[in-house]
Amino acid sequence: MEQTVYLQLEDGTCLTGKHFGAPLKEDVIAEVVFTTAMTGYTETLTDPSYYGQMVVQTFPLIGNYGVNPKDFESKGIHMSAYITREWCSYPSNFRCQMDLDAFLKQQNIPGIYDLDTRYLTRLIRERGVMNGRLTAACPDKTSADALKSFAITDAVSHVTCKEAYQIPSPLPRHHVVLWDFGAKENIIRKLHALNCDLTVVPASTTAARILSFSPDGIMLSNGPGNPKDNPSIISELSRLCKSGIPIFGICLGHQLLALANGADTEKLKYGHRGANQPVKDLLTGRDYITSQNHGYAVKNDSLPDNAVLRFINLNDGTCEGVSYQDFPGFSVQFHPEACGGPHDSEFLFREFVALMERRA
């Protein structure tokens, strides 16, 4: 028998749906966000940047091709709960190893389906991102007030690696230190494809320790949470900017690099999450479709004199990328390594390699 469960938002809205996935043994409280991606749900589920969030899939039917571990962007699911209109209980794909329900159970993540995800998405767009509670008991309206105090804290420490490790390339040309704030596997794949040896280090690593590896370049990964919650990382990163070593930041890495250079960040009303976000390259005038997953952005008017705004979002004009003039570094808010998603901006990895080659 299907269990009725409830999604309560901090504004008092309560939606009813049906439970799937792991047993809902206790209430789950998290930030409720939506993604507009039509495919790549396995990559979405295993993206560490969703730590502390419940994710709404705007596409109505999820799970058609099942789940295959080769599609994982990390070792498991980091989000708190999964929300969809309908899930496919009989997936059809030769690569399928399990269905969506079995995967959620394996990862101990509850889900809710058969609720109006279109209404929920429009609500978030109109009122902004809200905290929510997934519960098996019909909630009292007065309990919604308690949700407002929830905040995602210390997020990066929950998704970073615990100790440094090496990923050698068969044909190494460059040595890159990947500073792991919740790195996606496809960042590693893209760097490997460009013959980069990798040393992956935890978020708590100092600048001195990173420099001790004698890297040709430093990659700042994606990750979850408010970038301003990482003052020690920002401080260490500011030291690395003076080293002369090429630096490339993606998503959270982009925000941290901006903060390390004196810029500011702000929380967006409902963020950019999906595989269809248009950006403009102000350097070339070209437009690209990009994959994105972020709730914060670098403030355009806060960029310091050594920073040049390179990419902007064509929907709202927010900062999507910065180039730095006094050291060999650049960063983007979107995901050039997108999987699944558009590959329009993969060339940025080659630009990073070119910076390393010019310095060699």
Label each PLM-derived region with a short phrase:
Residues H175-D180, T290-S291, F330-F334:
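Active-site-proximal beta-strand elements of phosphoester/diester hydrolases
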